[in-house]
Amino acid sequence: VSCEDCPDHCSTQKARAKCDNDKCVCEPI
């Protein structure tokens, strides 16, 4: 998942979107 789509991608998992080296990382809230 790209950084651009990260917020939407993570919100479905109720997680926080973070960008690491242009990769999407979801952090549990």
Swiss-Prot record:
Organism of origin: Leiurus hebraeus
Gene Ontology terms for molecular function: chloride channel regulator activity; ion channel inhibitor activity; toxin activity
Keywords tagged on the record: Chloride channel impairing toxin, Disulfide bond, Ion channel impairing toxin, Secreted, Toxin, Voltage-gated chloride channel impairing toxin
Pfam families: Toxin_6 (PF05453)
Tissue: Expressed by the venom gland.
InterPro entries membership: Scorpion_toxin-like_sf (IPR036574), Toxin_alpha-KTx_8/9 (IPR008911)
GO CC annotation: extracellular region
Protein name, as recorded: Potassium channel toxin alpha-KTx 8.3
Origin superkingdom: Eukaryota
Chief place of localization: secreted
Highest classification ranks of the organism: Eukaryota, Metazoa, Ecdysozoa, Arthropoda, Chelicerata
Signal peptide positions (record): none
Record's miscellaneous remark: Negative results: does not inhibit ClC-0, ClC-1/CLCN1, ClC-3/CLCN3, ClC-4/CLCN4, CFTR chloride channel, GABRR, calcium-activated chloride channel regulator (Cl(Ca)), Shaker, and Kv1.2/KCNA2.
Function statement: Specific and potent inhibitor of ClC-2/CLCN2 chloride channel. It slows ClC-2/CLCN2 activation by increasing the latency to first opening by nearly 8-fold but is unable to inhibit open channels, suggesting that this toxin inhibits channel activation gating.
Location of this chain's protein in the cell: Secreted
Record note on domains: Has the structural arrangement of an alpha-helix connected to a beta-sheet by disulfide bonds (CSalpha/beta).
Annotated family: Belongs to the short scorpion toxin superfamily. Potassium channel inhibitor family. Alpha-KTx 08 subfamily.
Cysteine pairs bridged by disulfides in the record: C3-C19, C6-C24, C10-C26
